[in-house]
UniProtKB/Swiss-Prot annotation:
Name of the protein in its database record: Large ribosomal subunit protein bL21
PROSITE patterns: RIBOSOMAL_L21 (PS01169)
Subunit and interaction comment: Part of the 50S ribosomal subunit. Contacts protein L20.
Gene that produces this protein: rplU
InterPro entries in alphabetical order: bL21-like, bL21-like_sf, Ribosomal_bL21, Ribosomal_bL21_CS
Similarity comment: Belongs to the bacterial ribosomal protein bL21 family.
Length: 102
């Protein structure tokens, strides 16, 4: 059984017991969260597809950790103008573990 959920502007294919990193969610560690924007649920032969979401469907997940991703380095330059700019960015994320799909 798996589901496709939308969180943080992205879509993820999830199944029970799977751990994944999503955009930062303001929740405490070890707390349960519900992802209600479920786009699709597949259970063996039956497949339910929402328009755009499935009514009453939810995916329960547990917050495992909060963190920051790898540093992305940005370098801008204009040739012949002696202009150089360096910048870095680290995106915050939340690691969750899927507990149940209902």
């Amino acid at each position: 059984m798996y589901a496709v959920v939308k969180t943080g502007g992205k879509q993820y294919k999830v199944s029970v017991g799977e751990k994944l990193k999503v955009e930062q969610i303001p929740a405490e560690l070890d707390s349960q969260i519900e992802l209600t924007e479920v786009l699709m649920i597949a259970d063996g032969e039956s497949v339910k597809v929402g328009a755009p979401f499935i009514e009453g469907a939810k995916v329960t997940a547990k917050v495992v950790a909060h963190g920051r991703g790898e540093k992305v380095r940005i370098f801008k330059m204009r040739r012949r103008k002696h202009y150089q700019k360096r910048q870095g960015h680290r995106q915050n994320f939340t690691q969750i573990e899927i507990v149940a799909i209902a």
